[in-house]
Amino acid sequence: MKSRTRVVVIGGGIAGCSTLYHLTQEGWSDVVLVERNELTSGTTWHSAAQVTNFGMNQTMVGLKSHSIALFKALAENPEYPINYHHGDGGIRLANTPEQMQGYRHFASMARGMDVHFEVIDAAECARRHPLISTENLLGGLWDPLDGDIDPAQLCQALAYHARKAGAEVYRNTPVTALTQHKDDTWTVHTGHGDIDCDIVVNACGYRVNEVGAMMGVHHPVASMEHQYFLTEDIPEIVAAGQRMPLIRCPISDYYCRQEKNGLLIGFYEQACKTWGMDGIDPNFVNALCPDDVDRVMDVLEGAFARMPALRETGIRAIVNGPITYTIDGAPLIGPIPGKRNAFCAIGLRAGLGEGGGHGWLLAQMIVHGEACYDTWVIDPRRFTGHANVELTALKAVEDYQNEFRFHFPHEHRPAGRPAKTTPLTPVLAAEGAEFTVVNGWERVDYIKPAPDFHPTLGFTFDEAFDLIGAEVHAVQTAVGLAEVNGFNRIEITGADRHAFLDRMICGAVPKRAGRVGLCYLLNHHGRIKGEATVANLPASDRGPDRVWYGSAAASEFHDMDWLQSHLRADEDVHLRSLTNDQTILVLAGPRARDVLSSCARGDWSRAAFPWLSVRECFIGFAPATVMGVSFSGELAYEIHVPNAALYAAYLALRKAGAAHDLTLFGARAVDSMRMEKGFLHWKADLITEFDPFETGLSRFVKLDKGDFIGKQALLDRQGKDPVRKLVTLHVDTTHAPAHPGASLMQGQQVVGTVTSGGWGYRIGTNLAYAFVDPAMAAPGSSMMLDLCGDMVTAQVIASSPYDPDHARMRG
């Protein structure tokens, strides 16, 4: 066994084997995999092993598409062939118009990844799968490449090819401890000796937190018992002369695929069970949980109704084994929060079908720092301090119960709520607030007219449309107040704070006390890493000279990791998170200055407190820090208040605002207004696949300043054509917004992908942002938007169509 290697991958299931294989494909041959028992002895061995292209965003579709291509190549390789039923096809069933509408959106989205789904009616479903009844069925989504694979053979093939490329695999080698050294390298202690390495990867399946504990971290992963049945031969299958397509049914929560001349039927029952919450038997190897048929009988009845032939078929085997889930059902692939040189590939509820892509993207992250796709939807840092073991279990149960029910726009499911609140949460609830969830925080979405107001879930504009319009109108004509909680806030102190930020930020860094700037951070490839508001606060009784770095709520762990990883030992720079200590009250509208002047001492005139200023003050008697910034395009102030004084500040603002028709507003109104202004959302419009020039942010880049992260990559690309360009679109329909991922077409060619969409109430226009081919980026260019199957004209317009000179927000 080696005593020194570059990477140690812990875990010999699909995640570990795929990561090892793809590291060798990236040219790293000095890599090792250690497995406590035999390969595939955890969840992998009993996987139903379905392989589909279907995903709810382009990153997931892309990684699954890679899996399919990889598995097909492995199956055709005569050196180590494997059993892969490729191209059986699969149908996701639907019995509501909203489900069918969703499938049309996902087909539009997948087309941009060169993946082609087909939305079919009930009769066509039955034609393609002769066993199913069309009762209570509208249709489904057809994936022509759906199939299944032998999980053990797949992992052995990946390990075989990795070893051939120079990797080593140590079976029956349990990890007993992990030690990280001052230089951020690791020692992996095993039952057969120690291995020193640069990087550790946790790919331990349901034992993820046993290894996590060795690092001093908890991963938000929980295991669920999952059962499937194997039937005896079904005469209709024997007689069919063709393999049956796979079925996934959100109506009755089951899936089925052909297994020999029968079916494998798996269940996602409502009376589901977590597993391993109180620890896992160390001898649970190649093992299963006890059968519990009664628990799935209601689901089985639904399968009987859909496939009557099952009623005459016997069951030859029952499999009940643990599978892992995260808080949102997507895996955790990437850097482990708070740790250097540590990565994970965990929480893989659909590991076999996705595993080729998981290892592919993770290997790119390890070797190159980023993957070819923006991987935020699978990034481990998307969950923060609220993601404890109990909340994870609650969300795992909820996701399991809704396995085949996709999230609709503006749908926020109830389990594990409220996880994060402020003193204003119950106050705003009493005012009629409908809440959305942002990084666990309960944030006001809009104010509803009655407690029983529940808009229809779907892909069209919903019943809240006019309510949101009224909130926007109030902000435009008078003044509005919104709580924006969870906003990521990092305090940066030390003599070298500005030099540090100059190195991190691609543009000008505000350095004068009392001034604020919007800044962008790039990765080493010169592409968008982060967006931050940087405010310079002078020394006061509240603290020394300092910078407040503010960014999106979801970026809390991501941005702290990025900043900390670039601190130098010889720099006087200190970082401290204030995220959970402060909450923002946004005061916006033409009367905002009047309200602020009524409850805070001092001169708040435009001359004394211009746009992009920051000042400490009191709102009433509540200590606050006010910034003159706007995400709405109206005159606005961000009022940052310690949570202990938040209610006092709120009362003072409400009292002062009473004479000015102050109205509460929420996140959906903000989203409408920011689109009219050309303002972008992190991880919607600002992603790691594009640089600031492609994203329309050239004014925030200073190539003539000193070195900064990503500068050389930008210089290297000078003179080269951009891959895509971000544009603003007018969408010619009043029926529905453009949804992220939707494809833009020119004839049969995909020429762009939507990143954001919504109604602009102040200009009366349906708006969208999209990355499009550069040839289509000029104002006036017209293309067709595939909006849930309807082809709608979309025309490029100038960015910031509302008040393009920004006069209103300067006051």
Features from the language model and the residues they span:
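Central beta-strand plus flanking loop segment that forms part of the substrate or channel wall
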Residues: 48-53, 89-92, 217-242, 298, ...
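Glycine-rich FAD pyrophosphate-binding loop
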Residues: 24-44
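Flavin (FAD/FMN) cofactor-binding and adjacent substrate-gating region
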Residues: 70-73, 94-165, 170-171, 176-184, ...
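Beta1/beta-strand and adjacent pyrophosphate-binding region of the FAD-binding site
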Residues: 2-15, 32
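C-terminal catalytic lobe of FAD-dependent flavoproteins
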Residues: 151, 251, 260, 282, ...
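Dinucleotide-binding Rossmann-like beta1-alpha1 core, especially the glycine-rich loop
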Residues: 48-128, 251-256, 261-262, 290, ...
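Flavin-dependent oxidoreductases
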Residues: 18, 177-289, 298-306, 385-412, ...
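Glycine/proline-enriched, intrinsically flexible loops and inter-domain linkers
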Residues: 373-374, 379-811
